A protein has these predicted regions:
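Predominantly extracellular/luminal regions of secreted and cell-surface proteins
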Residues: 1-7
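Accessory beta-strand-rich segments of carbohydrate-active enzymes
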Residues: 9, 20-131, 153-154, 168-172
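Solvent-exposed, conformationally flexible loop/turn segments
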Residues: 27, 87, 141, 185-189
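Short glycine/proline/serine/threonine-rich loop/turn segments at secondary-structure transition edges
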Residues: 40-44, 83-89, 157, 189, ...
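A beta-strand/beta-hairpin structural motif
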Residues: 73-75, 180-183, 189-199
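Short, solvent-exposed loop/linker segments at the N-terminal edge
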Residues: 134-142
Length: 211
């Protein structure tokens, strides 16, 4: 069951040092069998790991997806080319190696945060593909800048229009922006930039944490 840290149940020994909380270094494996439903046919499937500590290698159906030496950032791998047809058994394995360099604090060992499958259409907003800033903010008006990375995994170019909305806690639309029609080439990604103007926004304060 994830999240998981295999070190916390090991025996303490001073020979390992404080950086590992006096717990042993080592290599561990995670294995998972799963069957995709028919609804995933023709769609894009990725695996997202919020955190693996550390030096991880991920495999799907015998194919090595990649190696990540670091342990404090999320990891995304595209599974689509290597998956079996819906209804057939898939096998995933993750190798984790905690030997070698360590931080100055206890960082755990294994898949210490959540992991999940991300299923999308061929044309979709990329994972972590929404970037929002507020370049202008006052009690009278605010401007929200949104950059959205649209990914096209299909074999031909696609025409895309994005509609962004800002809603309050009740669902009322406070601002909206429809982008121009853009072309996203086959196998590429494109950043769509939009601005939304808010009139008399409810500003965030500790007493009124409006988001």
């Amino acid at each position: 069951q994830l999240p998981h840290d295999w070190n916390v149940k090991q025996d303490f020994d001073s020979k390992w040092g404080g950086a590992t909380a006096y717990l042993p270094e080592g290599i561990g494996w995670y294995q998972k069998e799963f069957i995709l439903p028919a609804s995933t046919s023709g769609r894009q499937v990725s695996i997202v790991f919020d955190g693996i500590f550390m030096q991880s290698d991920v495999y799907i159906n015998g194919h090595h997806l990649g190696h990540r030496p670091y342990g404090f950032c999320s990891i995304v791998y595209d599974l689509t080319p290597y998956l079996k047809a819906p209804g057939e058994l898939n096998f995933m394995a993750v190798r984790v190696n905690t030997t070698g360099g360590r931080p100055r604090w206890y960082a755990g060992a294994g898949i210490y945060r959540h992991a999940w499958l991300d299923v999308t259409e061929d044309v979709h907003v990329d994972t972590y593909g929404t970037y929002i800033t507020t370049p202008q903010v006052s009690a009278e008006a605010a401007q929200v800048a949104v950059v959205t990375t649209v990914k096209n995994s299909s074999p031909k170019k696609q025409y895309v229009t994005l509609l962004q909305k800002v809603k309050d806690a009740t669902g009322k639309v406070l601002a909206k922006s429809r982008s121009q029609r853009v072309v996203v080439e086959a196998g590429k990604a494109f950043d769509v930039k939009q601005l939304l103007d808010l009139v008399q926004p409810k500003l965030w304060t500790p007493e009124s944490p409006t988001l």
